[in-house]
Amino acid sequence: AQNYLGAVDSLARIERFYPFGDYAEQARADLIYAYYMSGDYDQAYAASEKFIRLYPRNTNVDYAYFMKGMTGYYADEGLLGNIFSLSLSKRDITGAMQSYADLTEFLIRYPESEYIDAARERLIFLRNLIASSELDGAEYYLKRGAYLAALNRANYVLKNIPNSTEKQRALDIMKKSFIELGYEEYAEKVSSVEALN
């Protein structure tokens, strides 16, 4: 990280002293990566946005969009999560949701980019993380007796994140919620859906 901090300083100086021209343009692209590697994800995100705004027709603008999506998740990972080893799904997932949206935009804009495979891989991870977080909330509601709220959360995951690894967990929560609400016939329908999977 130390070398990248030095790189950030050098690249920022190039940008400051030579704000126009090819060197500044390349320095701004390199600055995104240097911030990212030094762990300054907020600055990497901001540098990505700045590059996109200043150079929308640059041949490497796909890289800026890609890095924007990659940094959003890390920006809110937080020190407390690292110290207390919180489950990823129990942390604030605002950044993960923003990262998902940014990477989805990247996929739509640049389907032929060299970064497409890495973006897809990260999207799968984020999709499962978001689904898991939603279902952690649903399980919290189950424990508190808020069965309708739990049912809504599980239903949200099944409707909006259908390809997640959390599908079975969502169905289990729906089944428990229906039983607790006295709707055994709906619980049986959920069981028949489970049998199809």
Give the residues covered by each predicted segment.
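Acidic, polar-rich low-complexity tracts and alpha-helical solenoid repeat scaffolds
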Residues: A1-N197
